[in-house]
Amino acid sequence: MYPAHLLVLLAVCVSLLGASAIPPLPLNLVQFTYLIQCANKGSRPSYHYADYGCYCGAGGSGTPVDELDRCCKVHDDCYGEAEKMGCYPKLTMYNYYCGTEGPYCNTKTDCQRYVCACDLQAAKCFARSPYNNKNYNIDTSKRCK
């Protein structure tokens, strides 16, 4: 084997080892975004829910600041239950439809059904809960104890 080929092979192996340490992106986040948009037709963009209160977005702690934030806590808890069932809610892809009455799930496996139900429940909760701009991008270290 030529030294240049060996170097290329070594570089590929090292890069693959490094890539294995990178956590996968949550694949169903796009689906959840579409469910939110379907349930909240003509409402605010779904990214407004990504950094709201103590529970909307990554992580969560303390007492939810309002009804909308409680929706996110319930969603987090629902994902926790899915994990206890052996599901991977952030990676589970499912089938859903956006009908005239709003979104609904149409999936085959137990994990798909459960995760879709979690997302659907949250999207509908977002639709009926008031959005308070004061709770967007809050200082969670002070308000989420």
Curated annotation (Swiss-Prot):
UniProt organism field: Laticauda semifasciata (Black-banded sea krait)
Stretch forming the signal peptide: 1-21
EC number: 3.1.1.4
Positions of the propeptide removed during maturation: 22-27
Primary localisation category: secreted
Active site: H75, D119
Note accompanying the cofactor annotation: Binds 1 Ca(2+) ion.
Protein name: Basic phospholipase A2 cPm08
Highest taxon above the source species: Eukaryota
Compartmental location: Secreted
Tissue expr: Expressed by the venom gland.
Keyword Cell membrane carried by entry: no
Lineage: Eukaryota, Metazoa, Chordata, Craniata, Vertebrata
Positions bound to Ca(2+): Y55, G57, G59, D76
